[in-house]
Every structure is written in structure tokens, then in C-alpha cells.
Swiss-Prot record:
Membrane spanning stretches: none
Keyword Ribosomal protein found: no
InterPro entries, alphabetized: Papain-like_cys_pep_sf, Peptidase_C54, Peptidase_C54_cat
Active-site residues annotated for this sequence: C112, D336, H338
Gene this protein is translated from: atg4c
Organism the protein comes from: Xenopus laevis (African clawed frog)
Name recorded for this polypeptide: Cysteine protease ATG4C
Lineage, top ranks: Eukaryota, Metazoa, Chordata, Craniata, Vertebrata
Superkingdom of this protein's organism: Eukaryota
Main location, first listed in the record: cytoplasm
MF term (GO), any: cysteine-type peptidase activity
Length: 450
């Protein structure tokens, strides 16, 4: 009887907190985000300039982008805007089906790191299925409450012709020259776009949805309503993709680095499993300092975000998690999950997509960043992994101020260095004892999220 009364109190408490958080995060302070005209902007490996083409800007201005192609340089703000809006935005939601073994129907106030982890994986899947150059054809139709930001000191008014996809943006999916073929490719890419979003839906059967991640988190001692750090979320995403049964997801896997070390042979084994070459998402949990972020690491972070292989960073500032996607000068560009939106039923044909795309980026100073974060990369095959390892090694060795790089690549398997790499799992226990200890250690090191 007493236990029943305690359960009722806990349910009442969670309902009160849910109502409070739903109200709190349904209101957003509208602050304008400004970008400088004279500095390049980097977004997940692409470089943009907010200048007119006759302004004398050259590709040398983007020399630290890590890319050999001058085509990455753009003089059009709208191209940057379209690219940014096309990234999948996953935020707090309310009124979704109740999470198993809990009374939660919202993740407001506790699920922000799960959301930023989802966004990073979603970007990896977009690149995997549609290519980095893909953009959503309706991106420029998204209403931006900060419309002044797009025009102040930077851009002309939107040209209606820009709302149509350029040939460059459609190159990955538009393989034929016939209008019918182009139309079919366009429909195919939009179907994939919707399918990727549906994998992150807020209902129990979604492979990478909140319900599934919380379910997997139980094996590491987490429950709905707990906070999750970037490293813990990395392992949950890895488990989620291992558990997925969709045939289209069998061609991609996730590797989580151990103690800031990527073991090349382990990555190759994942990519060439059973003779079938797979793409790999590499997640590297790191710390950028002790209690505070060491400013000397910023050059590393900028170099990483400039690479074409980068799919973002799960990080944030103390008590808040953000998805970092780029930078300008000393400011990071990010997507913010701290906005409560209503549940969307993705089982409905042509469900609305607008709430899954962020209309405007935000910026913050690097010095405000919490030192705990997870860096993400995507490699389509073993050859791309070799290239990524080469480029990243250059970036990680570029600073002479730090004696130790952010992370390293090591030849061989983790087990060669007395680490557990590819454990045999008990079908009833998703995490090995070694992993549980590591996750517990990560949990005590990472920042508390509200």
C-alpha cells in the first residue's frame, strides 16, 4: 500500500515537471544571429562567403577548409541557408506515446543530449543515402522568425528562382537527362528524406527514436527522465543501429572510439564484415580540457568541422546540449534541441516536415563550450576511411601548443593493447561488463543536463 502511494507521488511529480517543461520550452526568446560579411563560414565541411561574386573573394580565403576543390566556395547566402535548413532538426517533443515503464510523454528538460545525438546520426544517414550535396527542395520556403538576420549586412532579398534546386545540388540523385528521370530521382530522394526522419520518430518501433534509446539505456542504468552525456549517447546509437532490422540499414555501422583512440583494424573489420563492405559512422568521445574548455583546442575543432568527413559534434555548454555543425571566426554554429514541439505521427502519408528543419542557425563563443563532447565522422568505404584518417591526422598534428592530440589513430586491434573490442554479447544483455564500467565512468565525468 505504501509502495503504491509512493508510485502515485512519483507519477504526479513527473506530470507536474512535464507540464512545467512543456510550457518553459514552448517559448523561445527571439534573438538575432549575425554573421560577418568578411569572414568565411564553415558548415560540415563546406565553405561559404556572404559576399557578392564581384567582391574579389578567392578560394584562398577558405584555405583551411581541408578541401582541395574551389567549388566549395560560395558567394550566396541563400546557398548557406538552404544547406543549413536541409539538416534534420530534432527537438523536445510533447504528447508522444508513453515511454515504457514510465509516465513520461515528453522529453522536455532531460532529453537534449539524446536529441543532439539523433541529429548527428541523422546527418550521417543523409550523407549515406543522399550525399552531402543534397538539399531539401522546400528549404527556402521555411518561415524564418529571424528574417532580418538573413538580410542585415549580408544578402539581397530572396530571388524566387533560387527556390528551385540548382543542378549542383541535384547532381547526386539526378543521374539522367530526361525530365521524367529527374522527376523520379527527385521523388526517390524525398521518399528517402521522409524515411530517414521516420527512423527518429517518437514512438516505440522507431529504430533511433527516443523510446528505443531510452530502452537501450536501461542496460547501462539509465531511465526516462535521467540525463545522458555525449559518450553514453554514442554507445546507445551504436547499439540502436546494431539492433535495427531494416534492410537499408544493413549497409552502415557505428564505431565508438575507446579512450580517444581509433583502432584502424577494428574499423576495417566493421566495414568489411562477412565480405560486404559497409559505411561507418565514427564517434569519438573527447574532453577539450579539465573543468573548462582549453582555448588551445579551438583550432582542432575548427579543423575538424572544416573536413568533408565531419558530420558534427555532440556537445554544448554546461547544463545544455547542442549539435555543433560549423563555425565563423571564434564562434561555433549550432542547432538547438531546447524547443518543445508537438508529436508528429510519421505513419500518416505526407506527414508535415517543417518541424524537422531548423529555420535559423545559432552561434556561441567557443570559450562557453563544455569540455565533454563527441565528434562524428562518416566514411562510405575503407578507402574513404584511409583518406579521413590521413586528413584528420594532419589536423590533429597542426597545433604545436598541445603535447597530446585530441585523439589518435593506431594500427592494429584494440585487443592487441588489452582492450575489449568486439565482445560476444549475451542476447539478454546488450552491454558487456567492460562497457558498463566505461559508461559509468563517462557518466560521472560528463556535465549535468537540464
Amino acid at each position: 500500500m505504501e509502495a503504491s502511494g509512493t508510485d502515485d507521488v512519483e507519477k504526479l511529480k513527473s506530470k507536474f515537471l512535464s507540464a512545467w517543461h512543456n510550457m518553459k520550452y514552448s517559448w523561445v526568446l527571439k534573438t538575432k544571429t549575425y554573421f560577418k560579411r568578411n569572414s568565411p563560414v564553415f558548415l560540415l565541411g563546406k565553405c561559404y562567403h556572404f559576399k557578392y561574386e564581384d567582391s574579389g573573394v578567392t578560394a584562398d580565403d577558405c584555405s583551411n577548409s581541408g578541401s582541395d576543390s574551389k567549388e566549395d566556395l560560395s558567394g550566396n547566402v541563400d546557398e548557406f541557408r538552404k544547406d543549413f535548413i536541409s539538416r534534420i532538426w530534432l527537438t523536445y517533443r510533447k504528447e508522444f506515446p508513453q515511454i515504457e515503464s514510465s509516465s513520461w510523454t515528453t522529453d522536455c528538460g532531460w532529453g537534449c543530449t539524446l536529441r543532439t545525438g539523433q541529429m548527428l546520426l541523422a546527418q550521417g544517414l543523409l550523407v549515406h543515402f543522399l550525399g552531402r550535396d543534397w538539399t531539401w527542395t522546400e528549404a527556402l520556403d521555411i518561415f524564418c522568425s529571424e528574417s532580418d538576420f538573413w538580410t542585415a549586412n549580408t544578402a539581397r532579398k530572396l530571388d524566387p528562382s533560387l527556390e528551385k534546386s540548382s543542378p549542383e545540388n541535384e547532381e547526386y540523385v539526378s543521374l539522367g537527362k530526361q525530365p521524367l528521370q529527374n522527376s523520379e530521382k527527385k521523388r526517390y530522394s524525398e521518399d528517402l528524406h521522409r524515411k530517414i526522419i521516420s527512423w527518429f520518430a517518437d514512438y516505440p518501433l522507431a529504430y533511433f527514436g527516443l523510446h528505443q534509446l531510452v530502452k537501450l539505456g536501461k542496460n547501462s542504468g539509465k531511465v526516462a527522465g535521467d540525463w545522458y552525456g555525449p559518450a553514453v549517447v554514442s554507445h546507445l546509437l551504436r547499439k540502436a543501429i546494431e539492433e535495427s532490422s531494416d534492410p537499408e540499414l544493413q549497409g552502415i555501422t557505428i564505431y565508438v572510439a575507446q579512450d580517444c583512440t581509433i583502432y584502424n583494424a577494428d574499423v576495417y573489420d566493421l566495414q568489411c564484415n562477412k565480405g560486404n563492405e559497409k559505411a561507418v559512422v565514427i564517434l569519438v568521445p573527447v574532453r577539450l580540457g579539465g573543468e573548462r574548455t582549453n582555448m588551445e583546442y579551438f583550432e582542432y575543432v575548427k579543423g575538424i568541422l572544416s573536413l568533408e568527413f565531419c558530420i558534427g559534434i555532440i556537445g554544448g555548454k554546461p547544463k545544455q546540449s547542442y549539435y555543433f555543425v560549423g563555425f565563423q571566426d571564434d564562434s561555433l554554429i549550432y542547432m538547438d534541441p531546447h524547443y518543445c514541439q508537438s508529436f508528429v505521427d510519421v505513419s500518416i502519408k505526407n506527414f508535415p516536415l517543417e518541424s524537422f528543419h531548423c529555420p535559423s542557425p545559432k552561434k556561441m563563443s567557443f570559450k562557453k563550450m563544455d569540455p565533454s563532447c563527441t565528434v562524428g565522422f562518416y566514411c562510405r568505404n575503407a578507402r574513404e576511411f584511409e583518406k579521413a584518417a590521413e586528413e584528420l591526422t594532419k589536423v590533429l598534428k597542426s597545433s604545436t601548443k598541445q603535447n597530446y592530440p585530441l585523439f589518435t589513430f593506431v594500427n592494429g586491434h584494440a585487443q592487441d593493447f588489452d582492450f575489449v573490442c568486439t565482445p560476444v554479447y549475451d542476447q539478454n544483455d546488450l552491454f558487456t561488463e567492460d562497457e558498463k564500467k566505461r559508461l559509468k565512468r563517462f557518466s560521472t565525468e560528463e556535465f549535468v543536463l537540464l
